[in-house]
Amino acid sequence: MRNLSIYAGPKARALIARQGLTPDMVEVVAGAAGGPKWLVLDGLDRAIFTSWLMQRSGPVFLLGSSVGTWRFAALAQGMDAHDRFRDAYLGQRFTSVPTAAQASAEIMKFLDAALEGGGPVRILSHPHARLTFLAVRCPGPYAVERKYPLFMLMAAAGLLNAAHRSLLSLLFSRVLFYDPRDLPPYHAMGGFPIRRVPLTPENVRPAVMASGSMPVIMSGVRDIPGAGPGMYRDAGILDYHLAVPFAGSKIVLFPHYTDRITPGWFDKLLPWRKPSVEDMANVVLLCPSKAFVASMPGGRIPSREDFWEFKGRDDERTAFWNHVLRASASLGEEFLEAVDRGTIGEHLEPIEPLCR
């Protein structure tokens, strides 16, 4: 494979060595935070969700964080909703640096595009997809919306995290939103205080928004129905790349934009922070190869920094994003070829070097 790299945990490798990889072997699909980086996964999303995964006979759990939640809220309805979300996302325009409220209003436009015409009901009635996702509940001081006080509070959280990741439990708690038709295998995940909230047609929209409401950049979401009073913010604070105990005995398919798995947002500058092999044992990580990334304009994929790099040149930014999006089709093609031919086992690399 030239464009796609595949890493697999020890249990996943053993399963694939015996059986290959079929849709019914996949129990969970994971979607990480990361802003516009998700655009490089469009080809994989199309391959997995349009033709391959929907051949399965039972439910599949979609676990999202931040923009991964937004992707899955669209994909859990079908490709029409995904295309509306993608097109609205590509259409973002900012004439100046937006306030948090302005950024939230703009982002709500493309979430509304994905959820229009009864999206929450479609999500909760999909025959196979079971949408689940994370958010973070913030205590009193972290509910403030004034930019500079919140920035200083988040900086203090970063210092606590640098000392030990577990110290973030003093400040934040996880919230797991889930489709109540089936409990996900990670329903009992530990590591941080957790609140589990069943999804309803009434809370899908604010909960999905909260999962990607990045502090300082966007406003938080208050008092989500069913979740209790409080301020809810971006899941990536605790679960940036979903280095979580997935549990279960089947495959966790993880289309990802990089071969690095960063546990929390504050860990981005701490390269020694990695997931455990135990938590990644069932994971099959699909990501663009280094050769693919090098072949993109500037030798990189889209990122949030593009809003600053292309400030005042939205058409150039959109052209770059569209180039990567179109090129990503090759990732999906290589994945489908490997699973259809039964050769995916030949392309697996151990995930252990990516772990601690």
Q: Predicted segments — roles?
A:
Residues M1-F61, A74-R356:
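Patatin-like phospholipase
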